[in-house]
Amino acid sequence: AADYPFDDMLYGDFQKFPGHWKDGKLYSMMVRCGHLGVSYNKNAISAEEAMSYSCFWKPEVKGKVGHFDWHLPSLGMMSLYDGNGAGLWDLSSGQWKKVQNTTLSLRPQVGGYFDYGGTFNSLKNGEMQAMCGIGDWITGVLEKDGAPVASVVPKEGGIQWTESYCIGKGSEKADIV
């Protein structure tokens, strides 16, 4: 840890970020992070509507709600919508069943499941008007290019993601990192 300065971290919370440290020892280094919430086309969903995951059920976007192809963020968003808050992953069997039912109730709204390229293109060309499982790591690029899209963390909460580097114990090339 002495090789890596932490005094320039964006937020103090990230200096000893849980999961990267154990017993005072650094095991991985955060490279970038962001938040997942409601990503939407501003011509189809208002900023006010986007402040709740309920906008995914808006009749006007039927068949135009996309899902990023990794299930975890989408299920986490449904769990937040169901009121599970910070316990969104630690569910009883009843809570999990409710998340499943909420997710399945969204099916008529869904227009597709997309990888990175498909997510990017379907929002850019307007094929999808809202997207579960992403955030400004995609919409920020599209906004800079003039697309009428945005991402927000809604009132029910969002999901934080991080990408981190680590050097495996016994690495023969640790000195080049």
Predicted feature locations:
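Extracytoplasmic ligand-binding site segments that recognize negatively charged/polar headgroups
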Residues: A1-G111, D115-K124
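Beta->alpha turn/N-cap motifs
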Residues: Y116-G117, G133-I138
